[in-house]
């Protein structure tokens, strides 16, 4: 139609879209205004992309342009409309712009420049009213085209594009996904941040040689998202001209290998992929988990995928983006120097909490749409902060995204609970179906018809109620709050929910009182531990160190291990959170390696360390090193970095975090002297000076047996004293409570008088063995007798047993459940 050489998109705008717009508005000829409307229809045109980059609202531009153009009331015109003289002038101006840019074609960008050079008319007025200036537009077009004077338009190809057919890529279509197409179709999640990494990828891809980037980072930090971000930038034309027409395809290597039964099939597939990339010349291939190239498809006498791709990569015939973890890169790729030099590494670090919050805010819309919920700002912040604090061995933003995803899923499932009314109706319909089946078998068709009608009525009723319920649910807006995120973390990590709630501070304030209910005596020990724990939970501890580290000194049976068990249940809500390591198992030097795992080549290497594996699985726990003086001295050397840095490297090279553990070390050093310093097995009243002397002696004993660098890293050294008589009575009450709990099923209750308790103490307590001797005394004096009487039938279910003292023995009386019958039996 025109003597000028137009690109395919420019032809389509003038000859198709502009014609359609003129006919739609009942105009009798095509004007520059119709051409501008046509440009807006061609979403992939460079002109449209320039307007979008300049923040021009295309919908508003279209509305203002249409409102400025008067729609004719005449009859619609059919056939091809003539063009106004202004269109000829527009194309002449566009040709001048093309010549100024040393282009041998007229593209949509030149048409847009020509419209702004008109300096009159509706199209010009609307464009300028939107803030568009000729100079700014020309500069932006030059930026997108790259260097001025280029003879190749990256967005709208020259006559070569018009004449050459699109290269077919059947193998790639089968084994790869087009990320640029997915970005164009809005099928990818938004990529927030990572501007530096994306620009580094663009820089490497724009190199002349060795233009293959490889993304290195821990799992979940967003390596694949960077490639998706590149695809989005290509679609938005926010890349240099050399990349504007590129397609980013992600290759599924497992699919390439799958189904290759015979020798040569895999090699043929790889060869076809390379040939198709060469022919297309606009494809960037992305291979996730690049280390799988090493050895992929390799057999005896055959090449693997990596060796087949090396020549093409070195000559720059194909461009490849790789992604893998740092460990896999070292293990597989670094060993192949020829492959390493063909890729340029880009380190992808874990984003900060602030960046993660920004990422979550950017992508939450997709999850809100999927789960039909709304995420509050508090929930988004909690997902980033709490996932960083409580979920280990995974990385942001992946673990935070998983949290909001699962919280949305959980809320949706809670709201979708099927009402009991529906279940009852379905059950009734099922029963009627069974009844109808029996009636039909008996050939009573009249009753069967009645049952059928009843079933139909019930099904209609159920359908209406379900529809009503669905409509009501859609009206309800479900909000994901901070507590929902905490519940999900509790389910993932097995940390009790109360541990995650803010009410924990109230529990910590009353910590001593709660511990005293289960641990008798040892006020100094409980007070010291409570203060240390409060310091750490208030944020006053060094971030990397454990929550607290203590050495418990004292004779056996005074409550060292008992306090550790109670403390683990108080802090972590679970008695199983106690990791108890008996140091008598580590008396030999070679046994020390069992804590962190056997070295390579030794038995048990794959099993990991006895300490490190347990802490990896339960990072919130209390670690009890029982009777450390029995262990080999090298054990204390291993504990040095745990106490100071809060981490330990296991035999696999993994760093295990101890910053959320409490470490308690027990020892019996100086126990004999502590016992000797007590009066008659009980602490003497007013013996504070003696207690201090005993403590100082025990500490001196500790210094003689352990290195200063070990003791210097401990938060507090606590000396447990022997128990007073009142303490022993409290312990008997606790043991009696446990005994009554054991026989609770038979409704039997045992009561002890004060005299009976004194008898147990006099008979059973030995200051050398502590409170454990009381347990043996209760077993011998009470449990043995009661068990015998139960077997003889003298004590029945529901009886109450009262135990008292009579001179040198205990007497037992029974309160029967039906009638009271007293028996007094002497036990010598």
UniProtKB/Swiss-Prot annotation:
Q: Which family does it belong to?
A: Belongs to the ClpA/ClpB family. ClpC subfamily.
One family from Pfam that matches here is: AAA
Region (II) residue spans: 480-671
- UniProt GO BP: cellular response to heat; killing of cells of another organism
Tell me what gene encodes this. tlyB
The species is Brachyspira hyodysenteriae
Summarize where ATP binds, as residue positions: 217-224, 554-561
| Job description of the protein | Bacterial hemolysins are exotoxins that attack blood cell membranes and cause cell rupture by mechanisms not clearly defined.
What InterPro entries does the annotation carry? AAA+_ATPase, ATPase_AAA_core, Clp_ATPase_C, Clp_N_dom_sf, Clp_R_dom, ClpA/B, ClpA/B_CS1, ClpA/B_CS2
Q: Where is this region: Repeat 1?
A: 7-72
Cellular component GO terms held in the UniProt record: cytoplasm
Q: Report the SMART domains cross-referenced here.
A: AAA (SM00382), ClpB_D2-small (SM01086)
The name under which this protein is listed is Hemolysin B
Q: Which GO terms describe its molecular function?
A: ATP binding; ATP hydrolysis activity; toxin activity
> Record's superkingdom?
Bacteria
């Amino acid at each position: 139609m025109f003597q000028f050489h137009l690109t395919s998109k420019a032809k389509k705008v003038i000859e198709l879209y502009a014609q359609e717009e003129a006919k739609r508005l009942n105009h009798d000829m095509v004007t520059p205004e119709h051409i501008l409307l046509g440009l807006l229809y061609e979403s992939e045109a460079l002109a449209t992309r320039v307007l979008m980059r300049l923040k021009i609202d295309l919908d508003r531009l279209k509305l203002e342009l249409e409102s400025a153009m008067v729609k004719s009331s005449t009859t619609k015109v059919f056939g091809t409309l003539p063009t106004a003289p202004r269109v000829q002038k527009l194309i002449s101006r566009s040709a001048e712009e093309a010549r100024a840019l040393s282009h041998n074609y007229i593209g949509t960008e030149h048409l847009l420049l020509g419209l702004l050079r008109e300096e009159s008319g509706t199209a010009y007025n609307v464009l300028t009213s939107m803030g568009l200036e000729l100079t700014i537009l020309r500069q932006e077009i030059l930026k997108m085209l790259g260097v001025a004077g280029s003879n190749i338009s990256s967005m709208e190809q020259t006559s070569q594009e018009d004449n050459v057919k699109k290269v077919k890529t059947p193998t790639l279509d089968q084994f790869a996904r087009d990320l640029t197409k997915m970005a164009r179709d809005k099928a990818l999640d938004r990529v927030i941040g990572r501007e530096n990494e994306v620009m580094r990828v663009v820089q490497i891809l724009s190199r002349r040689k060795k233009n293959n980037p490889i993304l290195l980072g821990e799992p979940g930090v967003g390596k694949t998202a960077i490639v998706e971000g590149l695809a989005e930038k290509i679609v938005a034309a926010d890349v240099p001209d050399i990349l504007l027409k590129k397609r980013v395809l992600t290759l599924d290597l497992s699919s390439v290998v799958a189904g290759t039964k015979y020798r040569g099939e895999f090699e043929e597939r790889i060869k076809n992929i390379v040939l198709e990339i060469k022919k297309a010349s606009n494809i960037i291939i992305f291979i996730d988990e690049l280390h799988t190239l090493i050895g992929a498809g390799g057999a005896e006498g055959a090449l693997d995928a990596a060796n087949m791709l090396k020549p093409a990569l070195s000559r720059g015939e194909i461009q490849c983006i790789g992604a893998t973890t740092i460990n896999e890169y070292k293990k597989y790729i670094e060993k192949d120097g020829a492959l390493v030099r063909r890729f340029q590494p880009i380190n992808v670090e874990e984003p900060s909490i602030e960046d993660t919050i920004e990422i979550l805010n950017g992508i939450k819309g997709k999850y809100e749409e999927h789960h039909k919920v709304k995420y509050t700002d508090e929930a988004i912040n909690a997902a980033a902060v709490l996932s960083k604090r409580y979920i280990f061995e995974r990385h942001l933003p992946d673990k935070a995204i998983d949290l909001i995803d699962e919280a949305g899923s959980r809320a949706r499932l809670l709201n979708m609970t099927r009402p009991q009314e529906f279940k009852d109706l379905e059950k009734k319909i099922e029963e009627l179906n069974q009844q109808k089946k029996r009636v039909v078998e008996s050939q009573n068709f009249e009753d069967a018809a009645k049952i059928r009608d009843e079933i139909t009525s019930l099904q209609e009723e159920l359908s209406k109620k379900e529809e009503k319920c669905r409509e009501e649910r859609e009206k309800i807006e479900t909000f994901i709050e901070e507590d929902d995120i905490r519940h999900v973390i509790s389910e993932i990590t097995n940390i009790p929910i109360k541990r995650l709630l803010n009410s924990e501070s109230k529990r910590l304030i009353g910590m001593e009182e709660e511990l005293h209910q289960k641990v008798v005596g040892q006020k100094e020990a409980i007070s010291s531990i409570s203060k240390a724990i409060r310091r750490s939970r208030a944020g006053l501890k060094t971030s990397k160190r454990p929550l607290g580290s203590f050495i418990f000194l004292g004779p056996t049976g005074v409550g060292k291990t008992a306090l550790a068990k109670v403390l683990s249940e108080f802090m972590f809500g679970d008695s199983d959170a106690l990791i108890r390591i008996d140091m008598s198992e580590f008396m030999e030097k070679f046994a020390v390696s069992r804590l962190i795992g056997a070295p390579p080549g030794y038995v048990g290497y794959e099993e990991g360390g006895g300490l490190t594996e347990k802490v990896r699985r339960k990072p919130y726990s209390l670690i009890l090193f029982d009777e450390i003086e029995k262990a080999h001295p090298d054990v204390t050397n291993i504990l040095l970095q745990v106490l100071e840095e809060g981490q330990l490297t296991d035999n696999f090279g993994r760093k295990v975090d101890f910053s959320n553990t409490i470490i308690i070390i027990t020892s019996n050093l100086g126990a004999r002297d502590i016992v000797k310093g007590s009066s008659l097995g009980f602490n003497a009243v007013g013996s504070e000076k003696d207690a201090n002397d005993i403590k100082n002696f025990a500490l001196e004993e500790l210094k003689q047996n352990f290195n200063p660098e070990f003791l210097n890293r401990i938060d507090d050294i606590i000396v447990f004293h022997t128990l007073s008589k009142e303490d022993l009575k409290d312990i008997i009450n606790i043991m009696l409570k446990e005994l009554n709990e054991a026989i609770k099923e038979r409704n039997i209750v045992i009561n002890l008088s004060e005299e009976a308790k004194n008898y147990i103490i006099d008979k059973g307590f030995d200051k050398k063995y502590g409170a454990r001797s009381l347990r043996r005394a209760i077993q011998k004096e009470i449990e043995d007798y009661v068990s015998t009487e139960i077997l003889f039938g003298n004590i029945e279910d529901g009886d109450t047993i009262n135990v008292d003292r009579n001179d040198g023995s205990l007497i037992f009386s029974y309160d029967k459940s039906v009638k009271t019958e007293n028996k007094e039996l002497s036990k010598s």
